[in-house]
Amino acid sequence: MDKDERLLKIVLRYREELQRKIKERQYEMQQDNNDHYLIYNALGFTSKEGYQIDFQQNVGRFLYKYAGSLLEELAIKCIKEAHPDAKEKVKLPNTIDKSPKTVEIDCLVGKRAYEIKWKDATTDGDHIKKEHKRVKIIKDAGYVPIRIMFFEPNRDQAIKIQAKLKKLYEDIGGEYYSGEDAWRYLKKETGIDLKKLFEKLKE
C-alpha cells in the first residue's frame, strides 16, 4: 500500500463514520419533541422547513468537526511519513499559571512543534491571549512553535485575529503558514501533495 492509498483509507474511514453519525442523529430527531416549531411557524417557517433547518444544523456541526479532525490526522500522517520519529499529541506542563494544567503540541519533530488547524474563524479576542500563553510555554520549553492552517477565514474580524496570531508567532521566533502557504509548506516538508489528493477525490 503506497502513501496515497494509506491516506485515502483514512479519508474513507472518516467518511463512513460521519455518515453513520448523521444517520444516528436523524433517527434520534424523529423521536424529538418539536414544540419549539411553534416559534419557527410564527417567524414564517413551516414545521417541515423547521425540521430541515434543525437537521442541517446538526449535520453542519458534525461535518465541521470531522473535517477538522480528518485534515489534522492526514497532516500528521504526512509529517510522520517524512519523519518516522515524529511524536503526536505531546503535552507540556503549563509553566506560566495554573490554567490549563498542560498545553498540547499536535505533532513534534525534533524541536519543531506543530499546531495544525484546518481553519480558524474565531472572533474572540481572548483567543489571542490563550494562544500567546500556549506559544510562550512551547517556546520556553525549547521548541519552535509552527502553526499550519489550511483555510483562511472570510470575515473581517476573524481575519484580523489571524493577522495578530501570525505576528505573535513571528515575534516569538516561530512560524505561521495559512491558506496556500500551508499546503505548500506541508508539501515541501513531507514531499506529499495533500491538496492534490483532495482534488482527486473531488473528481
Where do the model's predicted regions map?
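Domain-level recognition of nuclease-like catalytic cores that cleave nucleotide substrates
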Residues: F150-E203
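Catalytic cores of nucleic-acid endonucleases
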Residues: W118-D171
